[in-house]
Regions:
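Residues in soluble alpha-helical coiled-coils and helical-bundle/repeat scaffolds
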Residues: 9-13, 96, 100, 168, ...
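Residue-level signature of catalytic and energy-coupling elements of molecular machines
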Residues: 22, 79, 94, 117, ...
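Acceptor/aglycone-binding surface of glycosyltransferases and processive sugar-polymer synthases
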Residues: 66-68, 72-82, 99-175, 197-215
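Hydrophobic helical membrane-anchoring modules
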Residues: 176-314
Length: 314
């Protein structure tokens, strides 16, 4: 069996095209395909539409309704934990990945050429602000976390059941998922593709969500910011000692305090700002530790439905 995990949030108007795309994938394979739809607290009619018998589905499906919006990565993690296939694909509901990419990702694993296959964007059609944020974030993540991660990030991937089982055992924060794909090892392959322009709606991946994801993923996978803080502390200490020695000699030789009240105040301001930044970084790590030790689930399932193919209605 092949499983396709699709997180759903405000995707009501994308569902007809999504089902058509998934039906095309089913047509490509002779073995059974299941689709795991994880409705991430979506406020629209997505859950009802996916149950509708008016839309012809050539595949079995699981409909997992979460109790609220936990975030796309939490929904993906829930889908991975519940998928039953020997190969599991994770894709978005916006249909911006070509069907041939899905089949290529699966074929790499089915034909035993890889354990993890990752779709890598060759181009980005996003707005300027999104492209800039993405470029900065992934550059930082590659620098601090893992430089094997693609420059444009990861949106779609497939993995074998063996890899999925290892990710379940790790049970890390959902924000660490992309990093885990490159941390767990195994045979990995990347497949380039040109992303299709979004036809309907707009991304719900807001700046606030991106910022939270950036902080969570970096604190889950890198201790480099703490090293930077240590370096900053050493540099600040050296500067402070140098200034103290300068003031002391100035008073011993000229018997007066050195001029320059403004530079001193500015220096204090810079040091205080550095300290506040350091406290913020430490706080982010402490919060990540606190979140992980609480043992709360990454999501809560409110309802689950098992649906068979309704091909007979066509």
């Amino acid at each position: 069996m092949i499983s396709i995990v699709v997180p759903i949030y405000k995707s009501e108007f994308n569902i007809p095209d999504l089902i058509t795309q998934l039906n095309s994938v089913v047509d490509y394979y002779s073995e059974e395909v299941e689709v795991v739809f994880v409705i991430d607290g979506s406020p629209d009619r997505s859950f009802d539409l996916l149950q509708s018998k008016d839309i012809i589905k050539k595949f079995k499906s699981q409909l997992i309704l979460l109790s609220r919006n936990f975030g796309a990565l939490s929904a993906v993690q829930t889908g991975l934990f519940n998928a039953r296939g020997r190969v599991i694909v994770v894709k978005a509901a916006d249909c911006q990945e070509p069907v041939i990419l899905l089949t290529n990702l699966v074929d790499e694993i089915v034909n035993d050429r890889a354990d993890i296959s990752i779709g890598v964007r060759e181009t980005r059609e996003d707005n300027v602000k999104t492209r800039i944020f993405s470029a900065i974030y992934w550059a930082i993540f590659r620098r601090l976390g893992n430089d094997d991660v693609p420059r444009r990030g990861v949106d779609i991937f497939a993995l074998s059941k063996t890899v999925r089982d290892q990710i379940i055992v790790i049970d890390d924060n959902p924000a660490a998922l992309v990093g885990l794909l490159y941390w767990v090892g195994f045979r990995r392959v990347e497949i380039g593709y040109d992303r299709i322009e979004r036809k309907i709606g707009k991304s719900s991946w807001s700046f606030r969500k991106k910022a939270k994801y950036a902080i969570d993923s970096l604190t889950s996978f890198s201790g480099a910011p703490l090293v930077w803080l240590a370096v900053l502390g050493v540099v600040s200490a050296v500067i402070s000692v140098a200034l103290s020695v300068t003031v002391m000699f100035w008073q011993l030789i000229w018997h007066q305090s050195p001029p320059g009240y403004t530079p001193i105040v500015l220096g204090i301001g810079v040091l205080m700002s550095s300290m506040m930044f350091g406290f913020a970084v430490l706080g982010a790590y402490v919060w990540r530790i606190a979140e992980d030790t609480r043992g709360r689930p990454s999501s809560i399932i409110a309802a689950r439905l098992e649906l068979d193919s309704n091909m007979s209605q066509s």
